[in-house]
Amino acid sequence: MTPEVFYKALEDFDIHLNDFQKEQFDIYFQTLVEWNDKINLTAITEKNDVYLKHFYDSIAPILHGYIKNEPIKLLDIGAGAGFPSIPMKIIYPQLDITIIDSLNKRITFLKQLSEVLHLEGVHFFHGRAEDFGQDINFRAQFDIVTARAVARMQILSELTIPFLKLNGKLLALKAQAVDQELTDAQNALKLLFSQVIENNHYQLPNGDSRYITIVEKKKETPRKYPRKAGTPNKKPL
């Protein structure tokens, strides 16, 4: 997917990038490749692949109408090189973005990236989701939490649901079918007072399958969740 094809694909969804936004995506690509030589951010570095498998893939929540250009608070857990939240921020500048990542090198990259992209309303924190999820400054503070290829839903739900406001939504982006994951996660979702409200299967322009699972928080999360760092992975709910 060349940049021009990327722009055209967005126009099909009535999203028209201005020259500054197009330049932001180009600088994003250049910065990603440059930093990838220093720290391992992605195995995908060919320009057309980055535009398809990172940029286009990341904005799926916008293309499918789950996120609007509004000043909502969005938390991205384990964003790595900034996916999916930074591409969405470029398209919808009103979004207030927070990223938590467990690797400090990635946070350093993201801070530099936000500077060269001239982004405002982006916040980066190094640490574990389990720890931040018990912090009153983060717990129940977000309208939307996104997670792209982070963990199985049984684990991911405990790492993300505590951050949501009541009726807030988790958007889990996956490359594989999640039917079995959702079956395995039934107990976790019940304990966390949350419910799957949609499971959307779609395709990238090249035909690759993708999935967005949307989970809504129905009641306040019990105080004991999330458990201490590492426990959700070792002993899933």
UniProtKB/Swiss-Prot annotation:
Residues 218-237 are annotated as: Disordered. InterPro entries: rRNA_ssu_MeTfrase_G, SAM-dependent_MTases_sf. GO terms for molecular function: rRNA (guanine-N7-)-methyltransferase activity. Its EC number is 2.1.1.-. Keywords: Cytoplasm, Methyltransferase, rRNA processing, S-adenosyl-L-methionine, Transferase. It is found in: Cytoplasm. Transmembrane segments: none annotated. It comes from the Bacteria. Its main location: cytoplasm. GO terms for cellular component: cytosol. It is an enzyme of class 2 (transferase). S-adenosyl-L-methionine binds at G78, F83, A129, E130, R148. Specifically methylates the N7 position of a guanine in 16S rRNA. Belongs to the methyltransferase superfamily. RNA methyltransferase RsmG family. This is Ribosomal RNA small subunit methyltransferase G. The lineage of its organism: Bacteria, Bacillati, Bacillota, Bacilli, Lactobacillales. The gene is rsmG.
